[in-house]
Amino acid sequence: MVSIRLPDGSVRQYEHPVTVAEVAASIGPGLAKAALGGKLDGELVDTSTVIDRDASLAIVTDKDADGLDIIRHSTAHLLAYAVKELYPDAQVTIGPVIDNGFYYDFSYNRPFTPEDLEKIEKRMQELAKKDEPVTRRVVSRDEAAGYFRSIGEKYKAEIIESIPQSDEIKLYSHGGFTDLCRGPHVPSTGKLKVFKLMKVAGAYWRGDSKNEQLQRIYGTAWTKKEDQDQYLHMLEEAEKRDHRKLGKQLDLFHMQEESPGMVFWHPKGWALWQQVEQYMRRRVNEAGYLEIKTPMIMDRSLWEASGHWQNYRENMFTTESEKRDYAIKPMNCPGHVQVFKHGLRSYRDLPLRYAEFGSCHRNEASGALHGLMRVRGFVQDDAHIFCTEDQFISESIAFNTLAMSVYKDFGFDHIDIKLSLRPDQRAGTDETWARAEQGLRDALTACGLTWEELPGEGAFYGPKIEYHIKDALGRSWQCGTLQLDMVLPERLGAEYVAEDNSRRRPVMLHRAIVGSMERFLGILIEHHAGAMPVWLAPYQAIVLNIAESQAEYAQSLTQTLQKQGVRVAADLRNEKISYKIREHTLEKVPYLLVVGDKERDAQTVAVRARGGVDLGVMPVEAFVERLQEDLRSFK
């Protein structure tokens, strides 16, 4: 007798072993038809999986997030099936699920074209309509490797040969196509109804630039056409908001080949940067942080002591001088520990909070660079808190409160929080980890925050909290972190004198709110579509004269506003006023101040707000008061 416990708590009993599909059918024909897989004691499995023991089971349908993942994974295999039918000489490699879709990497003797993608997608639709059953079989490693070698699929054979002998090898087949996969997959290809191929990009075999370059075909798949249409619309909107495009249009920054992954900031872009940096500086100063500055280049010995030289060297820029090896810092933490160590610290000094807008460099692969979002040179709003074990919860609470407030000020109201817990390989005792993890939970609870826990995702030296902000298009970006470190203080010899005169290691909290300033500015630009809030805008207002006779008044007005702290410029060009208004409207300036003879004579100004809103004529003081009202919450 097999007892199956369902999500509603009910138990069904079967005289013999049953498949997931049979359990679904016993519940009802509708569920049997909708079933894509099952969650058996928490593990995602195929509908053909046989249950021969008492277990808990949830039937997975297209209404579940797991169901969508199964659909996307199966659609990746459908893509490979179609490619092999149309281009038999192409070799298949891997095809995982990614955010909003999937990809599959192929080795082929010529580049795939947009026309090829159309043909492949059409063939996928034809194969899906055949509604061919998807079957799974478990084989030995040698049998699987031999099969793929026999059909000329060298990449698949190489993958299999790297799998431990003891691991289970699953092969999935539909129609004339067989692929290696952990699964699960849909029961038949007819379940795959809504998908689209998006683009082709380059990729290296096993992600190593020394290996052969492959072709990566990206696709998206959904359960409903409305969802796919909404996603494609979001992509169109994202293209309009692309920070690289807006950076050029708004004259904020540029990148060039002579300095890959580094940013050339233009005056308006640097003005935007300064608003973000000065705001962050004010917030950390108010929160009791002490700002410091540490060297960009430090001797190899320090990086060896911290462990970065052994574990991170390939991502570091190094140099040599007078027979000494140096590294340009990829992160600020070892330098902050040196400041902490400079002098004898007492428990009375703690907590010590060191902040730095630290300039870091990492040798990212050139193919991974992407505008401001992935760079080699960046500044981080970095800080490290040195405290006692008794203080780390209160410090975590204070940081959570600060981070949430900052995100709100920048216009981000939806924050997803994730707590990464102990990995298998880790430093410290289970007792220490349990205290650290529970402390972070308590800090989040005290702030009224909810979070998702990620078992095994913590760093080997401690658990961490991640803060993921959601932008105007619903995209999620990880920006902030709060990382507890049980290792670096010991590695670098940081200690303080406790109340009983013993020497103890401080608890070290690594923390950042925006993370990379460059990346955060890219996110901000796209979130606001370049129309920055008044407090962030490079220029808050532009004064426009209609004719030469108002130039002197326009210039005087500009100077008056500048003295009151307004970021303002005058456009006195001998151009039609309609032309000047249109140009500055495209530049997304919050306020355009138009002055003609009437405004000059009355010492007033005609105000146009962003979006073409005519606010009418008002005294200069009234405009300044309106602007101050916009800014008041950030003063």
UniProtKB/Swiss-Prot annotation:
Primary location recorded for the protein, binned into one broad class: cytoplasm
GO cellular component terms, A-Z: cytosol
Keyword set, alphabetical order: Aminoacyl-tRNA synthetase, ATP-binding, Cytoplasm, Ligase, Metal-binding, Nucleotide-binding, Protein biosynthesis, RNA-binding, tRNA-binding, Zinc
InterPro entries reported for this sequence: aa-tRNA-synt_IIb, aa-tRNA-synth_II, aa-tRNA-synth_II/BPL/LPL, Anticodon-bd, Anticodon-bd_dom_sf, Beta-grasp_dom_sf, TGS, TGS-like
Natural source organism: Burkholderia orbicola (strain MC0-3)
Catalyzed reactions per annotation: tRNA(Thr) + L-threonine + ATP = L-threonyl-tRNA(Thr) + AMP + diphosphate + H(+)
HAMAP family registered for this protein in UniProt: Thr_tRNA_synth
Pfam families xrefs: HGTP_anticodon, TGS, tRNA-synt_2b, tRNA_SAD
Protein's name according to its UniProt entry: Threonine--tRNA ligase
Localisation: Cytoplasm
Cofactor(s) essential for the protein: Zn(2+)
Listed CDD domains: TGS_ThrRS, ThrRS_anticodon, ThrRS_core
Reported function: Catalyzes the attachment of threonine to tRNA(Thr) in a two-step reaction: L-threonine is first activated by ATP to form Thr-AMP and then transferred to the acceptor end of tRNA(Thr). Also edits incorrectly charged L-seryl-tRNA(Thr).
Gene3D superfamilies the UniProt entry points to: 3.10.20.30, 3.30.54.20, Anticodon-binding domain, Bira Bifunctional Protein, Domain 2, Threonyl-trna Synthetase, Chain A, domain 2
GO MF assignments: ATP binding; metal ion binding; threonine-tRNA ligase activity; tRNA binding
Free-text remark on how the cofactor is bound: Binds 1 zinc ion per subunit.
Family classification: Belongs to the class-II aminoacyl-tRNA synthetase family.
Annotated stretches, region: Catalytic: 242-533
Transmembrane segments: none
Binding site for Zn(2+): 333, 384, 510
Domain TGS residues, every copy: 1-61
GO BP terms in the entry: threonyl-tRNA aminoacylation
Protein EC: 6.1.1.3
Subunit structure and binding partners: Homodimer.
